[in-house]
Amino acid sequence: MSWNHQSVEIAVRRTTVPSPNLPPGFDFTDPAIYAERLPVAEFAELRSAAPIWWNGQDPGKGGGFHDGGFWAITKLNDVKEISRHSDVFSSYENGVIPRFKNDIAREDIEVQRFVMLNMDAPHHTRLRKIISRGFTPRAVGRLHDELQERAQKIAAEAAAAGSGDFVEQVSCELPLQAIAGLLGVPQEDRGKLFHWSNEMTGNEDPEYAHIDPKASSAELIGYAMKMAEEKAKNPADDIVTQLIQADIDGEKLSDDEFGFFVVMLAVAGNETTRNSITQGMMAFAEHPDQWELYKKVRPETAADEIVRWATPVTAFQRTALRDYELSGVQIKKGQRVVMFYRSANFDEEVFQDPFTFNILRNPNPHVGFGGTGAHYCIGANLARMTINLIFNAVADHMPDLKPISAPERLRSGWLNGIKHWQVDYTGRCPVAH
């Protein structure tokens, strides 16, 4: 069934939803908002007044979608319900990214269906079964000692520099090195991964506006396919060889599937973990008592609180394959539902004192790795380990780190990113504040 702007408007008017106190025309995926701040107060207003709210969008201003808008989902339990019902709420229909450039061509949205994030069963089930081989506790555990050594080196080199951009010198390095180690990518090529992922996700940011994200994606896929060809000729004891060989149940990834898997790793793995690290350090700078506690205790619970607090993916979307009632609100077939993880992770009905950064928080049922179900983050354990290792290294080598300037935010309607953050690693800089 096709939904145009008018038919969606009629369906929305027939559904009784409270009206929150928001500025006229407010759009929760507007990248201009996130370039300046997070809409913390607006999310709180929705959770209180209209947890499931129709976010209308004018034609031509829907970030690549021309359906009149979407349902904004702001409470944690609703996010989890949508995530559990992948038979009702499709990742494939419109993809999971809720915001692109307004003038993006529909075929450029649809091509992203080749990435596992944007698949439904049974194709998603098959791919995830194969790819999960690389993320077993044993596979991740084998990286621990090497990544611990690398984390210490990263922090020591940054500390020796005295000051600099925390994002480029610290945050991005270990996630990139973890991915490089997992895939067997030469460490000297990790800079390419960094730039390709920036260019693919920052297409609405002025810093990357001159770059064609399709070209960056094509370069990365080409790089990955060449790597797969090399491993096919010269097998090794690594995850790439396992993924492209039919050594388990006769299943393997095609060259195309492997290429798009690397795209997913570069974005979903690298971008999210590095933004968690940056915003975790920002949180420690704003909550020095928690930093003192971390330096003394190094609690395992810290990584999950950092991910909850940062929520590096602001939102993903699904599309309803049939009519569905969600917490009393009628979702119509064809309508998009955008799960705002950033709001859900501060749900007052789930978290005690949600606006308190508490690295001992336990339990911590956040959705920073996705709601639950088929699309829960396959690399969550690797991300936790990476976060723990880098903060241990920062605590060892630059325990008195202080900000020099305010962070520069990424202009994105779905990714909570920090592009640059100047810091003094010694804590002695007189202009630090």
Curated annotation (Swiss-Prot):
Keyword set, alphabetical order: Cholesterol metabolism, Heme, Iron, Lipid degradation, Lipid metabolism, Metal-binding, Monooxygenase, NAD, Oxidoreductase, Steroid metabolism, Sterol metabolism, Virulence
Induction text: By cholesterol.
GO biological process: biological process involved in interaction with host; cholesterol catabolic process
UniProt entry tagged with the keyword Oxidoreductase: yes
A GO molecular-function annotation: steroid hydroxylase activity
Residues where heme binds: C377
UniProt: substrate binding residues: G202
Function noted in UniProt: Involved in the utilization of cholesterol as the sole carbon and energy source by degrading the side chain during infection. Primarily catalyzes the sequential oxidation of the terminal methyl of cholest-4-en-3-one into (25S)-26-hydroxycholest-4-en-3-one (alcohol), (25S)-26-oxocholest-4-en-3-one (aldehyde), to finally yield the carboxylic acid (25S)-3-oxocholest-4-en-26-oate. Also able to sequentially oxidize cholesterol itself, not only cholest-4-en-3-one.
PANTHER family with a match to the protein in the record: BIOTIN BIOSYNTHESIS CYTOCHROME P450, P450, PUTATIVE (EUROFUNG)-RELATED
Protein name, UniProt field: Steroid C26-monooxygenase
Species of the source: Mycobacterium tuberculosis (strain ATCC 25618 / H37Rv)
Lineage per the UniProt record: Bacteria, Bacillati, Actinomycetota, Actinomycetes, Mycobacteriales
